[in-house]
Amino acid sequence: MNYYTTAETPLGELIIAEEEDRITRLFLSQEDWVDWKETVQNTEHKETPNLAEAKQQLQEYFAGERKTFSLPLSQKGTPFQQKVWQALERIPYGESRSYADIAAAVGSPKAVRAVGQANKRNDLPIFVPCHRVIGKNSALTGYAGSKTEIKAFLLNIERISYKEK
């Protein structure tokens, strides 16, 4: 069974999903949520303890009171994607890394584009902070598809400097 709840944030209403007692998705837009919900069976709006905690931690993050998340997270991906997502979780609050930095950190220094694709497939943005990955010249690059304004907002919360493309 999949459960979900909504969280009011400065970005608008975000939707958090849980499956098998693990947080599995954070939707930044209604469109993404609707697309997902149409493909998944057995989905119920219910605020489980994990979803309530995720919602609380998100609210603390947006209020500037939380620097790291401590939630039971799970997302499906290739072994390479899993390594990238783990590397993202190690980027400290208020710091950024380049795609090349992440590629090197996962032992594949030439896999810069693959790191970008793994970021794009991150189903847990904010919780797994792919917004902290910027271009090698501090350029603001893609986020959650084409949502660079969200990335800029998150970088500003954390006071991470970047350059507009």
From Swiss-Prot:
Example of a GO MF term: methylated-DNA-[protein]-cysteine S-methyltransferase activity
InterPro entries: MethylDNA_cys_MeTrfase_AS, MethylDNA_cys_MeTrfase_DNA-bd, MethylDNA_cys_MeTrfase_DNAb, MethylG_MeTrfase_N, MGMT, MGMT_N_sf, WH-like_DNA-bd_sf
Superkingdom, natural source: Bacteria
Catalytic reaction list: a 6-O-methyl-2'-deoxyguanosine in DNA + L-cysteinyl-[protein] = S-methyl-L-cysteinyl-[protein] + a 2'-deoxyguanosine in DNA; a 4-O-methyl-thymidine in DNA + L-cysteinyl-[protein] = a thymidine in DNA + S-methyl-L-cysteinyl-[protein]
Main localization of the protein described in the UniProt heading: cytoplasm
GO cellular component, one term: cytoplasm
Pfam families associated with the record: DNA_binding_1 (PF01035), Methyltransf_1N (PF02870)
Location(s), subcellular: Cytoplasm
SUPFAM superfamilies: Methylated DNA-protein cysteine methyltransferase domain, Methylated DNA-protein cysteine methyltransferase, C-terminal domain
Inducing stimuli: Constitutively expressed.
Keywords associated with the record: Cytoplasm, DNA damage, DNA repair, Methyltransferase, Transferase
More details: Bacillus subtilis contains 2 species of O-6-methylguanine-DNA alkyltransferases. Ogt and adaB are regulated in different ways, constitutively and inducibly on adaptive treatment, respectively. This enzyme catalyzes only one turnover and therefore is not strictly catalytic. According to one definition, an enzyme is a biocatalyst that acts repeatedly and over many reaction cycles.
Free-text function comment from the UniProt entry: Involved in the cellular defense against the biological effects of O6-methylguanine (O6-MeG) and O4-methylthymine (O4-MeT) in DNA. Repairs the methylated nucleobase in DNA by stoichiometrically transferring the methyl group to a cysteine residue in the enzyme. This is a suicide reaction: the enzyme is irreversibly inactivated.
Similarity field: Belongs to the MGMT family.
Identification of the protein by name: Methylated-DNA--protein-cysteine methyltransferase, constitutive
Underlying gene: ogt
